[in-house]
Amino acid sequence: MATFVGIGVAVLMLVDLWTVDKRYLNDSNFIRQKPTEVYKETVADQEIMKDKDLSYRVLNLNNPFLETTTSYYHHSVGGYYAAKLRRYQELIDHRLQGELNSVIGAFQKAQTAEDLMGAFAACPSLNMLNTRYIIYNPEQPPLRNPFAFGNAWFVDKVEVVENADAEIAALNTINPLTTAVVDKRFANEVKGFTPQLDSTATITLDSYRPNKLVYTTKTNSEQLAVFSEIYYQPGWEATIDGKPASHFRADWILRAMLVPAGEHQIVFEFRPQGYITA
């Protein structure tokens, strides 16, 4: 008898709880999967995404080194991450913040589009990062920077400096489009190399993935190529025509490589041995 009473009480409790719970959670308001909240495309985003080139960067003038929205759709100069590479943070502190302030000042004072173009021309560090678009108002089309250097380029001069302080200081005076600054720890990479101007030399980005980039070069003589990609030695491997090739750091933060004369394929691929072995 006690068993039946216990079962009866349990059934009554279950029915009572079920009827009460259904008032608050039923088929009409139960959602099996929470909808994903994404950043809504702005006018600026839509205009930029019409550009189908493989890789370029976007600068949002609204707090670019902390905001996250630009990185959702584009390769952002800020590239938000809570733990930035120290070297990149130092580039921000020593160069990019000042150039950003100059651009913002130009927007505040410019009377013509030519005034703004002059400001972009005076931002070599932003240009070597291939900053093609400037978002000044998300609901307006962005401005295109015609002075961005592109994905990669050849330089006419190499300047070897004594240390890291001299390397970043040199960015205040050189034109990175024509001169590469190299820390003396990489001096052997350019030992014996004599830059020769080759007006017909070309370097193009053929394929882009975050962990693999493929370029084609055509030159009449050996050239020094600088790539608008962050130099990070651990895990990155470089090849020329499928054979291992050396690359090194230039201009404080970028990749550089000596490229032999002729037509060649250059591949950068991220292959960390610890990950592959595991």
PLM feature segments, named:
Residues 43-49, 55, 120-133, 201-204, ...:
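Generic recognition of flexible, low-complexity loop/linker segments
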Residues 4-8, 277-278:
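Alpha-helical transmembrane segments of integral membrane proteins
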Residues 62-64, 135-139:
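Short, polar loop motifs at secondary-structure junctions
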Residues 178, 182-278:
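Active-site-proximal, structured, solvent-exposed surfaces of multi-pass membrane proteins
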Residues 113, 131, 138-139:
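Extended recognition/assembly regions associated with phosphoester-bond processing machinery
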Residues 6-40, 44-128, 144-192, 233, ...:
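Extracytoplasmic/lumenal acceptor-recognition loop(s) of multi-pass membrane glycoenzymes
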